[in-house]
């Protein structure tokens, strides 16, 4: 499972709910790109938090398993 602190997740959801409709009015592709970038940033941040707690970053393992 992803290790995401609840306040960080709530902040991400709030930012996404605020910005996605505004960005989507410009272009759908651009909003998807921004959403994917922010989501990957959140995943990278969560794996960093995991490594601070001396756990293996499971998200990297699951991503590699999905690619194969």
From Swiss-Prot:
Q: Transmembrane region positions?
A: 1-21, 28-48
Q: What highest taxon heads this organism's lineage?
A: Bacteria
Q: In which broad location class does this protein mainly occur, judging by the first location in its UniProt entry? A: membrane
Subcellular localization is given as:
Cell membrane
Question: Where is it found, in Gene Ontology cellular component terms?
Answer: plasma membrane
User: How does this chain sit within the bilayer?
Assistant: Multi-pass membrane protein
**Record's keyword terms, sorted:** Cell membrane, Membrane, Transmembrane, Transmembrane helix
UniProt keyword annotation of Membrane present: yes
The protein here is known as: Uncharacterized protein HI_0148.1
Source organism:
Haemophilus influenzae (strain ATCC 51907 / DSM 11121 / KW20 / Rd)
